[in-house]
């Protein structure tokens, strides 16, 4: 048989109330997650992809980085229910997923996924979540 002795019921009640409120009002947590995801995407640009993007064939340089337009267009948003990182650049999808582009769709562009999270990024997000709830129960 397991016995639990509670010496300070008020402290436990208070911690449970904070947890209940935090699960109803998640915007601060979503803000943290959005920031972590945006940092991960920035790192993808800084290192030329994770995994590395296919090199340019015709000219020298680093794909998706040389003009910095796509990189500068990355934004994050959050609300009570979600954390979002993305871009509104119309050409972003062809770089993310690859495909045919140009007049007549004759140019093959390889996928260079920049909106991608590594296992370490996912672990960082889980750490954000743990930190958020640990702060609430202290």
Curated annotation (Swiss-Prot):
Similarity comment: To phage Mu protein G.
InterPro entries per UniProt: Phage_virion_morphogenesis (IPR006522)
The protein's name in its UniProt record: Mu-like prophage FluMu G protein 2
Pfam families named among the record's database cross-references: Phage_tail_S
Superkingdom: Bacteria
């Amino acid at each position: 048989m397991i016995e639990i002795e509670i010496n300070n019921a008020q402290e436990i009640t208070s911690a449970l109330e904070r947890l209940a409120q935090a699960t109803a009002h998640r915007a601060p947590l979503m803000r943290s997650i959005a920031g972590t995801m945006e940092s991960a995407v920035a790192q993808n640009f800084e290192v030329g992809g994770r995994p590395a993007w296919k090199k340019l064939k015709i000219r020298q340089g680093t794909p998706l980085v040389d003009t910095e337009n796509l990189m500068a267009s990355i934004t994050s948003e959050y609300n009570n229910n979600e954390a979002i990182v993305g871009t509104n650049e119309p050409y972003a999808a062809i770089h993310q997923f690859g495909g045919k582009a140009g007049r007549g769709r004759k140019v093959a562009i390889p996928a260079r996924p920049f909106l991608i999270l590594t296992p370490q990024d996912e672990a960082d997000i889980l750490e954000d979540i743990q930190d958020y709830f640990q702060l609430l129960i202290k």
